[in-house]
Curated annotation (Swiss-Prot):
InterPro entries: Class_I_gatase-like, Peptidase_S51. GO terms for biological process: proteolysis. This is Alpha-aspartyl dipeptidase. Its EC number is 3.4.13.21. The lineage of its organism: Eukaryota, Metazoa, Chordata, Craniata, Vertebrata. The keyword Nucleotide-binding does not apply. It comes from Xenopus laevis (African clawed frog). Coiled coil: none annotated. The gene is aad-a. GO terms for cellular component: cytoplasm.
């Protein structure tokens, strides 16, 4: 197995209640990208209006001191990925995002840049979903049909962004998020699922993974009871799961 050079910042949500776009994690983004990165390649495929989405992301990253290029503005998306200093994939609909990644032949290109070349990768919400083994545990509606649910596989487990605890006062009779993840684990040979509540994110550096942010994460392992974990918890053992 090749040595992983991955540097990932996998964020549950782009906007935290009461704050601005990426405001809750901007200090971590600055530390993550550092001074060596000058420009970030943004992948806006998860939303329909890519121009407006790129404008929002560009304003934020320029305020942080980085230039931003959007892959949809490039005549050759694969070449744009090959030249990227850092990659940021934003949130939206995960099915739409993954289909566009396949349609533009970016799966292998992104994997090579991140896992072999060590290019920093930031994912938010849907961008975090596609960084995992598959999008089986996304919360989104399948509004389009990608050729596969298999994703970038930058980590060997799945993540459920925006993880939501059951509301004991609600009269809603639909399944809880925990019940849906449990259903997923009723299927044979399904990987761990890390439920990231809004306000937390996972930092992956090589073979080390650490929970950051202000909220806890809930870990689901097939055949076991879910467990709660505070910010600062070491999730490196998940990187050895296959």
């Amino acid at each position: 197995m090749m040595t992983m050079r991955r540097h990932l910042l996998l964020v549950s949500n782009s906007t935290l209640h009461g704050g601005g776009y990426l405001e809750h994690c901007q200090e971590h983004i600055l530390k993550f990208l550092g001074a060596q990165v000058k420009r970030v390649l943004f992948i806006p495929y998860a939303l329909h209006d890519r121009d407006a989405y790129a404008k929002t992301a560009r304003q934020k990253f320029e305020a942080l001191g980085y230039g931003l290029d959007s892959v949809h503005e490039s005549p050759d998306p694969v070449d744009a990925v090959k030249k990227a200093e850092a990659i940021f994939i934003g949130g939206g609909n995960t099915f739409r995002l993954l289909k566009a990644l396949y349609d533009n032949d970016l799966i292998a290109a992104i994997r090579k840049r991140v896992l072999e070349d060590g290019v920093p990768y930031i994912g938010s919400s849907a961008g975090t979903n596609v960084a995992t083994i598959s999008i089986n545990t996304t919360n989104d509606m399948p509004i389009v049909y990608p050729p596969s649910l298999k994703a970038l596989e930058l980590v060997p487990f799945n993540i459920n962004p925006h993880y939501l605890d059951p509301d004991g006062n609600s009269k809603h009779m639909g399944e809880t998020r925990e019940q849906r993840i449990t259903q997923y684990h009723e299927e044979h040979d399904t990987p761990p699922v890390l439920g990231l509540r809004e306000g937390c994110f996972l930092l992956v550096e090589g073979d080390k993974a650490t929970l950051l942010g202000i909220t806890r994460a809930r870990l689901f392992l097939r055949g076991k009871n879910p467990t709660e974990h505070e910010p600062g918890h070491d999730f490196s053992f998940l990187l050895g799961h296959s």
